[in-house]
């Protein structure tokens, strides 16, 4: 199922295309020696078009790219309808943002992504032996994610089942701190959240913890893997929430939501995400990986009482710590200026912007050679880094289906699951209903690929 040169694209094949996630731009880091690319001829006078979100690459970074590479970046607002139109018209952007964990297999299966192995092989900046294993999220061999050709690269990453906790909240509730390097169980995590939550006059004043992941799609596939199973069948053409492992994962998540100890579809956080709530001392545990340290590091008092903890595990299950995002860029197969696009790709993922991201603590760099730039000046930064470095040993790719997007999965789940979270539907009934609607969507996606 590799890309076929000259294959035609139709709108029907992209009816359910969607992409989500966050790619963050960063100001260039001054004073760093840069490796020099010798792989492409893109240079002065060239321009490339990136389909990204406004926050992905700031105007000053665009100016820095022109200064460093001689290439002008033009941006197009990320919009799936516009992307479909550009792809089918044969005039796509030169680089497109996507979420490696849930988008790679979907786009690769539809023959729209350029295989980047030849580019990596010639690059003096992005060397194969320097790539962190998280970049395997951007590989797909026609059947399974994590194997085969490379179609993109993550800009940075976190192991998103890890969590931060506030020691002051634990002290106040008389709850023991989790072990520094060994995981507690999901059952213990939820019990801690029940003890940590604070309510007054029927209102939640301090959330015990949040554990909803970046997307429900990535969360539930990861939870099922942690229970020792797979949410999908062998050829990824069906989900099955009724298997013992998937049911265990689903039950735990519904129990978390029913307990109302943290934000969920039935208990919204007014801030919209964990950062401001955790920063205000109104969240005892935050299911955010290393990347949130970029915010925590800006507040010394908060950093002093914050700890990063390993991803929980199910009792008797394997120890896994996946990445639920791995957001980055891919090159359309019909892009018009591939050499210049690759030069920008190298610059964004391996030169000044990548070094700035690594130094800021907003995610783990996806080049191993950049890890020494991760913040380690203070004692609390050293403590966080110790936990994170140990956790890297437990990373693995949790493959996602090529026949449905993470956004489509989430939309269906979000329509059905609240009834179970409110106690109006049993977990078994929810599992059967999810199987029905998600498998119907997967069936349509498989027909499109065929």
Report the location of each language-model feature.
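Extracytoplasmic/periplasmic substrate-recognition and gating elements
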Residues: 67, 88-89, 254-261, 298-364, ...
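Long, aromatic- and glycine/proline-rich binding clefts that accommodate carbohydrate-like moieties
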Residues: 145, 309-310, 359-411, 415, ...
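Short, solvent-exposed loop/beta-turn-alpha elements that line the ligand-binding surface or hinge
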Residues: 117-133, 179-182, 200-209, 229-248, ...
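Conserved N-terminal structural module of periplasmic/extracytoplasmic solute-binding proteins
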Residues: 1-112, 122-128, 315-318, 327, ...
């Amino acid at each position: 199922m590799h890309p076929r040169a000259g294959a035609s694209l139709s709108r029907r094949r992209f009816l359910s295309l969607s992409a989500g996630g966050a790619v963050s731009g960063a100001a260039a880091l001054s004073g760093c020696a840069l490796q020099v690319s010798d792989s492409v001829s893109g240079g002065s006078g060239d321009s490339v078009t990136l389909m990204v979100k406004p926050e992905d690459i700031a105007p000053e970074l665009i100016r820095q790219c022109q200064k460093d590479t001689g290439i002008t970046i033009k941006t197009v607002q990320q919009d799936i309808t516009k992307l479909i139109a550009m792809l089918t018209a044969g005039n796509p952007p030169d680089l497109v943002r996507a979420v490696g964990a849930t988008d790679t297999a979907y786009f690769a299966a539809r023959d729209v992504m350029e295989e980047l192995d030849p580019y990596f092989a010639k690059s003096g900046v992005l060397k194969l032996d320097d790539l962190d294993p998280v970049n395997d999220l951007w590989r797909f061999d026609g059947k399974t994610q994590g194997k085969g050709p490379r179609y993109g690269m993550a800009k940075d990453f976190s192991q998103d089942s890890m969590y931060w906790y506030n020691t002051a909240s634990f002290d106040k509730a008389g709850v023991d701190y989790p072990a520094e390097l060994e995981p507690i169980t999901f059952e213990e995590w939820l019990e801690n959240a029940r003890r940590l939550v604070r309510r007054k006059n029927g209102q939640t004043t301090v959330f015990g913890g949040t554990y909803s992941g970046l997307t429900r799609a990535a969360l539930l596939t990861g939870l099922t893997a942690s229970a020792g199973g797979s949410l999908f069948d062998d050829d990824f053409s069906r989900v099955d929430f009724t298997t013992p492992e998937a049911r265990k994962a689903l039950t735990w998540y519904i129990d978390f939501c029913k307990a109302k100890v943290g934000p969920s579809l039935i208990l919204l956080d007014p801030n919209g995400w964990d950062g401001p709530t955790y920063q205000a001392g109104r969240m005892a545990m935050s299911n955010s990986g290393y990347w949130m340290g970029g915010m925590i590091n800006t507040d010394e008092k908060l950093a002093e009482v914050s700890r990063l903890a390993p991803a929980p595990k199910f009792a008797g299950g394997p120890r896994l710590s996946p990445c639920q995002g791995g957001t980055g860029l891919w090159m359309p197969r019909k892009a018009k200026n591939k050499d210049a696009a690759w030069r920008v790709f190298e610059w964004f993922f391996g030169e000044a912007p990548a070094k700035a991201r690594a130094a800021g603590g907003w995610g783990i760099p996806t080049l191993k050679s950049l890890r020494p730039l991760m913040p380690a000046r203070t004692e609390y930064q050293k403590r966080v880094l110790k936990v994170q470095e140990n956790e890297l040993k437990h990373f693995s790719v949790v493959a996602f289906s090529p026949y449905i997007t993470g956004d489509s999965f989430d939309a269906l789940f979000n329509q059905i699951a609240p009834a179970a979270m409110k106690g109006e539907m049993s977990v078994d009934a929810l599992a059967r209903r999810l199987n029905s609607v998600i498998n119907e969507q997967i069936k349509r996606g498989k027909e499109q690929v065929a």
